[in-house]
A protein has these predicted regions:
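Active-site-proximal acidic segments at structured loop/helix or strand boundaries
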Residues: 21-45
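ATP-binding catalytic core of ATPases
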Residues: 1-24
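Charged regulatory segments coupled to nucleotide-binding catalytic modules in large multidomain enzymes
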Residues: 38-194
Length: 194
């Protein structure tokens, strides 16, 4: 329950409201890692054009300190009245025109915040735990998110190539180091003599 509270009410906790469960203080779990070292705050929080009261922010969390960008946590997060109601949105039943779950997009996160006055625009369910947004609104969000997401994706791929090259160079150094180790050389020589 503490983990759920930390995720669902992270915006309230970040704003200074304290929660505790069985006497244990609940720390926020912000899916955008907005204020963490290494997070690139790409956009926002800014209003979605034509929808005052709906704000959007986008982050690149690939190099966020102490966090490995999770494959499953990529995509969008929707908060109603500062409470998370839907997370990890990618192409699927609720939204289209974004990206499918892919390791090269794992660092891209976006967050949509809205209040109860926009329940119709977001198609908020009566239980306030899911959405079926209007296509016009999703088109506007996509127009903002996707160019930034593509740039994050490009950086991710470049960084992956660089890492791969660096990792290969390190592997070669390790092999050379092992090959020149006198103890290993003697062991190989003695086994060869058998």
């Amino acid at each position: 329950i503490v983990k759920r509270f930390a995720e669902y009410f992270c915006e309230h906790i970040i704003s200074g409201i304290n929660f505790s469960v069985d006497g244990k203080k609940v720390d926020p779990v912000d899916p955008l890692l907005w204020n963490q070292k290494g997070t690139i705050q790409e956009y926002g929080p800014l209003p979605v054009p034509g929808y005052p009261g709906i704000t959007l922010k986008i982050a690149d969390v690939l190099n966020t300190e102490g966090h490995k960008a999770s494959y499953q946590k990529q995509g969008g997060y929707v908060f109603r009245c500062n409470r998370l109601i839907v997370g990890s949105l990618v192409n699927g039943d609720k939204i289209t025109g974004f990206w499918n779950v892919d390791p090269h997009w794992r660092g891209v996160r976006w967050q949509l915040n809205y209040d109860a006055s926009h329940d119709v625009d977001l198609g908020t369910t009566t239980r306030k735990d899911d959405i079926a947004p209007k296509q016009e609104l999703m088109d506007k969000i996509r127009e903002i998110v996707m160019p930034i997401a593509r740039e994050c994706h490009r950086r991710e791929k470049e960084q992956g190539i660089i890492k791969t090259k660096d990792q290969t160079e390190q592997l070669v150094k390790n092999i050379k180091s092992v090959a020149n180790d006198p103890l290993i050389t003697r062991t190989i020589s003695s086994k060869g003599a058998l």
